[in-house]
Amino acid sequence: MNTYIATFFMHFGSIRYERLCKSKGYQARTMPVPRNLSSSCGTCVKYIASEPLFDRDHDEMETMVICNEDGSYTRIYKAEGL
């Protein structure tokens, strides 16, 4: 299992995504974006899963990173135009 953080352009996107994660049975929570990641709205969703979860309509998502064991992040998704 891996830990992922997804950031969003607006708060509603993070709330909606947290619900999606929980509906799939993943441990997920909305939280402030870590200082070394940026987000337009300041909230993100941190969740644990075997694979990243991409909603069919994920245009609300700004970025997604995987959390590495050493505390660093590896970006696995970035919205077009950023």
Predicted regions and their residues:
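Amphipathic, hydrophobic secondary-structure cores in small proteins
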Residues: 5, 11, 15, 20-22, ...
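C-terminal structural segments of small proteins and small subunits
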Residues: 51-82
